[in-house]
Amino acid sequence: MTIELQEVSARELAKKYFRGGEKSLAELKARIACGLAAREIDCETQARVFEEALEYVILGGRINATAGVEGVNTTMVNCFVQPIADSVFDPVDGVPGIMEAARQAAQTMRLGGGVGYDFSPIRPKGAWIAKTKSLASGPISYMEIFNSMCSTVISAGARRGAQMGILRCDHPDIEDFIVAKRVDDANMPWDRRPFRNFNLSVGVTDALMQAVEVDGEFELAHVAEPGPDIKAQGAYQREDGKWVYRKVRARDLYDKIIRATYDRAEPGVLFLDRINRDNNLRYIETIAATNPYACGLPAESGMENPL
């Protein structure tokens, strides 16, 4: 069955994906098929196989934009997650520090990839920094660096870069993160709005949802030692080594997430424990973040959105 393109679909197809004088969907599919088959032993036969398959599937945007385009050094992968350590410059256990992570993310976006980050490892605002005898500014302040970087870097194909910022629900700065994109003036110009180059999501754990269900307290904790003022307010160290900065009523925290989402459509939520239970590679990895593009998980009723 052949489905005719709607006018808006044809216009967007031409704007985003046509290359080298292409004028039709058939020409686009032929170019993609040849590009994907280029390294096969029998590339002509494989190209025909790919072209036939393209009658039934829609590939990712980066493949549509770059496959078969000569002289273009870009990625054909849409989705990346950039690790970040709790360090400004130095790597920690092989994970790059904040500035190096920003450099790597800039390169990824320049080549066409969308990038997600878990900012939870970064110590909270008010945490103690022993090397400089000072207090940390928190992950939200460092997110400004990534936001500005994304504004500057034009992604492959001259499109704006895409970023997803994630913070765990038990991070001590989570309440500030929830309202980080709040704008009180509806007339504020778009280019002046906070974190306009980010989608934001809260990493929600089973522990939070269970505390919400029983109307219990929920601990906001981090491995970083808090500063003197936070200690004076009652912060304490748990048996697992993490510091509990404070406790909140779970339903109040969850309500803040829901109200912010209702008012501004952000932040979203990632059900981290559910995602990792459904991850086929859970025995060798833990998923802490996603990139900006939503995905689906197969379920009996069809594709189910875990986000």
Give names to the regions the model predicted:
Residues 1-307:
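Extended catalytic cores of very large enzyme megasubunits
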